[in-house]
Curated annotation (Swiss-Prot):
It comes from Therea petiveriana. It is found in: Secreted. This is Periviscerokinin-3. It comes from the Eukaryota. InterPro entries: Periviscerokinin.
């Protein structure tokens, strides 16, 4: 679920 959000925050 939050994987997508973490991906963006990990830029």
């Amino acid at each position: 679920g939050s994987s997508g959000l973490i991906s963006m925050t990990r830029v």
